[in-house]
């Protein structure tokens, strides 16, 4: 199997090379030439690690001994034996993706990505040091830092928007330990940060960074996206095993969405054979995806809002490019759309393509007040505590269920622990909020009895190690400077 750029199908790479590079030379994203269709029914009988290895082997067939990579990636890192528990809450199900070492769904992929990159490096015969560049809207950063910490032959720089992540998310990153990690705040929003990283990939060559190869831990890297496909199959298998559905029944998934990677993984699962019903795209006040899926017009020329669900505060959803490539198969068309987005800030898809999009995806959005009401209501009725991102998805799922009433089970993806956003959650419960984030954590625990994840509780004792703040125009110079330093 070959991977090809979304913008030029002639630019191909092996699966391992695609994982190593992260992004294609023309700025496009790597996609498999064809998505493999699995004997998904046989997967229903497998444990999570075996299921993961089989799915990833189909997508990345040149990797040897995927089961061993999966075991090493996940061994001892998650707080529950079930990596991604599915729980019944009221009239729907919640897929808990926050049981990993940093309490966010990114752990599922970023526990494994270092294994994939390390083996790809060996397979490609690369002796250069790998420098992982990552832009984060909050959760990817810490998960990537933890995943790549002290991995031999690898360094990682994480950029995050200054003032654009929660206090807990920031504390997770700036206290990060490891001899190969750097964290830097960028004055601007996540889109500025993500665009800066993409420009570095586009502009740097071997002469700029001798002895160094760049790669990415963002979901622009297919090695980050692929492991997320697994938990859709696993959630479906859990429903079958529990007798809630029969094999072949459809299931809807509602996904809080910013960069479109998590929900795209669900579409991959569907294309690989899983009986997915609707994929429901849930946005916060930054509702560029809701508008796009409703009208076919993608327009980033709009006000950027800082919300209580900061990991979704995104106006340029990178993985949407992959979906457009999948639905059209036309690299020149996709390249033209991305050119329009970059140069004039918007594009419009054809009516035919909009119909294809709407045949697969539903959408909705809500603001912070609606999400807060949902947090309070779900706790009062179900004694289930959810974070603001999950609350956005729950609210949009409410809209969908009210409109359709088709009796098909709905799974809400819960992407982060409520303790990553304790101020927003405690406030939503009608409680007074202190200035100190750790005091708020304690108050939230006292109010609900829900345990604080150990990795978050321990943050209050950790010293700050990373204090760099730069302008977005200085990101390239920062990378060149740090890449040239022997010791971090």
What do these predicted regions represent?
Residues 1-488:
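PLP-dependent amino-acid enzyme catalytic core
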């Amino acid at each position: 199997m070959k991977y090809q750029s979304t913008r030029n199908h002639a630019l191909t790479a092996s699966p391992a090379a695609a994982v190593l590079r992260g992004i294609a030379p023309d700025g496009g994203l790597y996609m498999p030439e064809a998505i493999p269709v699995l004997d998904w029914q046989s997967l229903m009988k497998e444990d999570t690690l075996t299921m993961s290895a089989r799915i990833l082997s189909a997508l990345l067939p040149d990797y040897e001994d995927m089961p061993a990579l999966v075991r090493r990636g996940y061994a001892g890192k998650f707080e529950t034996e079930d990596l991604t528990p599915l729980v019944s809450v009221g009239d729907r199900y919640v897929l808990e993706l926050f049981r990993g070492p940093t309490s966010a769904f990114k752990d599922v992929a970023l526990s494994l990505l270092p294994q994939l990159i390390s083996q790809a490096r060996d397979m490609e015969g690369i002796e250069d040091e790998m420098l992982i560049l990552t832009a984060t809207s909050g959760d990817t950063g810490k998960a990537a830092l933890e995943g790549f910490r002290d991995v031999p032959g690898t360094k990682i720089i994480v950029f995050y928007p200054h003032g654009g992540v929660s206090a807990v998310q920031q504390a997770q990153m700036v206290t990060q330990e490891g001899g190969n990690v750097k964290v830097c705040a960028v004055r601007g929003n996540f889109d500025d940060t993500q665009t800066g990283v993409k420009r570095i990939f586009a502009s740097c060559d071997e002469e700029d960074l001798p002895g160094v190869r760049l790669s990415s831990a963002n979901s622009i890297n297919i090695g980050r996206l692929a492991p997320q496909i697994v938990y859709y199959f696993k959630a479906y298998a859990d429903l079958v095993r529990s007798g809630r559905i029969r094999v072949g029944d459809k299931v809807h998934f509602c996904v809080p969405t910013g960069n479109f990677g998590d929900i795209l993984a669900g579409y991959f699962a569907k294309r690989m054979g899983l009986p997915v019903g609707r994929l429901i795209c849930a946005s916060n006040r930054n509702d560029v995806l809701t508008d796009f899926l409703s009208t076919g017009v993608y327009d980033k020329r709009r006000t950027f809002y800082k919300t209580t669900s900061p990991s979704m505060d995104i106006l340029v959803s990178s993985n949407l490019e992959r979906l457009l490539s999948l639905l059209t198969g036309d690299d020149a068309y996709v390249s033209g759309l991305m050119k329009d987005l970059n140069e004039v800030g918007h594009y419009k898809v054809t009516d035919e393509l909009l119909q294809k999009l709407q045949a697969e995806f539903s959408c909705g959005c809500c603001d912070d007040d609606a999400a807060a009401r949902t947090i309070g209501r779900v706790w009062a009725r179900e004694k289930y505590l959810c974070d603001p991102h999950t609350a956005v998805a729950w609210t949009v799922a409410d809209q969908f269920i009210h409109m359709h009433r088709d009796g098909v089970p709905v799974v809400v993806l819960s992407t982060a622990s409520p303790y990553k956003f304790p101020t927003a959650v405690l406030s939503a419960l009608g409680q007074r909020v202190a200035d100190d984030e750790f005091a708020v954590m304690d108050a939230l625990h006292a109010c609900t009895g829900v345990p604080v994840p150990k990795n978050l509780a321990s943050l209050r004792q950790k010293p700050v190690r990373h204090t760099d703040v730069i302008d977005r125009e200085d990101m390239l110079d920062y990378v060149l400077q740090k890449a040239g330093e022997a010791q971090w």
